[in-house]
Every structure is written in C-alpha cells, then in structure tokens.
C-alpha cells in the first residue's frame, strides 16, 4: 500500500493513500465527498489507455487514508495536496477535481500558483461560492448546511442512502445508466469514511473560492450535468466558467451529480481530448 505522510496527530502520522499508474503526462484526480480515489475507476481506465500517468489519492478522513480529528478545511486540503505533489516530485501535471475535489483545484492554484500545473478541470464542482451572503445572494442559505449536519450527526448511514439516490438521480437513471450495485458500492465507501471528517466537511461547502478562481491562468475545462441535484449548475459551473478566463464549459444533458459514473461515455472522451 502506497502512502505519503502529510502531518502528525499526537503519536500518529497522517497518511494519504494513493495509487500511481502508467507513464506520460501526469494527471492528478481528486475525488468528491464522501468517496475516495476508487470513484475515478472509469476515468483512470480511459486516461491510462490514452497514455497518461494517472494518480489518485484519498483525501484525509476518506478511503484508505488516515482519519485524523482535525484539518477538514480547504487550506489544509490544499496544503496536503501541495505536500503530496512535492513528495512525488510532479511537474507539468493536470489537476482534475470532482465535486468537493474542485475546491482543492481552486485553492491549490490560488495559494501555490500554477507554475507546476499544466491544466485544470472542474467536474460537478462546488466553486465558486455556495453559501448565501450579502455579496453572494445566489448562494444557498446557511440553514441548509446546518440541516445536513444535523442529519449526518443523527444517522449518517441513513443520510447517505438518500444522498446517493440524489447523487445519481436513481429515480430517473436507475437500471439505465446506474445499477443498484454501483449505488451500494458508493454507499459502502462513504459510510467507511471518518464520521467526524464527513461532518466537518459540510462546513467547507460554504468556502469562498472566487479569489482562487481569478488566479487560475492555465487552460481550464468545466464539466457539469444539467440535472445535478447536489451542486446545481447555475450556482456552480455556470459561474466558474465565467470566473476563469478562457475556460470552456461542457454541459452534459441529463447528467446528475455523479456523472463520472452515469455518463462516463460523455465525460471521458472530452476529458481525454482536453488533456492530450
């Protein structure tokens, strides 16, 4: 098992589990909540076939990485990513973020710059700013996030069942573009994540990435489904597309939040073409 230490909590090392396959231009894939690097299975296969070096890692608290009690904020996540790419000595790499992972892409470039980054991809991502504030009236009211936290604290497994039904739009796509087994597989990954980490991450969904996006100066692709119930396109991708100079927007018709699984046939060719 490959892992990299990004910190310490008491006597234990905080380790990030990762997988590093193939040769060629490196691509770092950053997963969403509450999943792990395993959620990129269909994209890893496509990118390897296209001749890339493909690297996935599990965010702290998720997948096979350590589950510390602290550090569930985007400054720390970006620092973890910085330590990770530094220890792997990556150069000229593409960053691809799904959902929450798009926040790492934005905060990493906003904090550390794009000197080592070749391209950026946001897939069904949370930026630019989900929280409703006086200067962001299009955002989501904070009470919604508080309600989610209460539901997770009360019964996280039950919350995840409802969450993944909306993640994949099971009522519409079940038995067609998504199987019960894939939904159950996602639930199994999610329920095995850190309970505290899962809860703490909800607060990060209100992070303001507007300044980070303004600092992105590499070719950027934004991919989003127009049927996304988790991060609706109008509040996220449409605005990210406008915020990043020269960014290209790909709208996947009928695509839910989990479109990397349900619509991999649409996502993968565009991703491979953009990263070549």
Task: Give short role names for the model-derived ranges.
Residues 31-33, 93, 97-102:
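Conserved alpha/beta-hydrolase "nucleophile elbow" surrounding the catalytic nucleophile
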Residues 128-131, 135-139, 150-214:
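Conserved alpha/beta-hydrolase catalytic His-Asp/Glu region
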Residues 10-70, 84:
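Conserved HGGG/HGGXW glycine-rich cap/lid loop of the alpha/beta-hydrolase fold
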Residues 245-276:
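Catalytic active-site module of serine/aspartate enzymes centered on a nucleophile-bearing elbow/loop
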């Amino acid at each position: 098992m490959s892992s990299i230490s990004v910190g310490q909590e008491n006597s234990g090392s905080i380790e990030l589990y990762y997988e590093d396959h193939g040769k060629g231009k490196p691509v770092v894939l950053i997963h969403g909540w509450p999943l792990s690097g395993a959620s990129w299975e269909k994209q890893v296969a496509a990118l390897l076939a296209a001749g890339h070096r493909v690297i996935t890692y599990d965010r702290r608290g998720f997948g096979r990485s350590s589950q510390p009690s602290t550090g569930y904020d985007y400054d720390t996540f970006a620092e973890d990513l910085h330590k990770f790419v530094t220890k792997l000595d990556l150069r000229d790499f593409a960053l691809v973020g799904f959902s929450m992972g798009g926040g790492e892409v934005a905060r990493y470039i906003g904090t550390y710059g794009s000197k080592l980054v070749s391209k950026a991809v946001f897939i069904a991502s949370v930026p630019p700013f989900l929280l409703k504030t006086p200067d962001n009236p299009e955002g989501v009211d904070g009470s919604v996030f508080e309600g989610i936290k209460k539901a997770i604290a009360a019964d996280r497994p039950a919350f995840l069942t409802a969450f993944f039904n909306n993640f994949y739009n099971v009522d519409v796509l079940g038995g067609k573009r998504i199987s019960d087994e894939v939904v159950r597989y996602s639930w199994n990954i999610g329920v095995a994540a850190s309970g505290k980490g899962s809860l703490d991450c909800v607060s990060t969904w209100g992070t303001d990435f507007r300044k980070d996006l303004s600092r992105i100066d590499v070719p950027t692709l934004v991919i989003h489904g127009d049927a996304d119930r988790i991060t609706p396109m109008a509040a996220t991708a449409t605005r990210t597309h406008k915020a990043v100079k020269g960014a290209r927007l790909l709208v996947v018709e009928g695509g839910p939040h989990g479109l990397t699984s349900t619509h991999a046939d649409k996502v993968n060719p565009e991703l491979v073409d953009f990263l070549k």
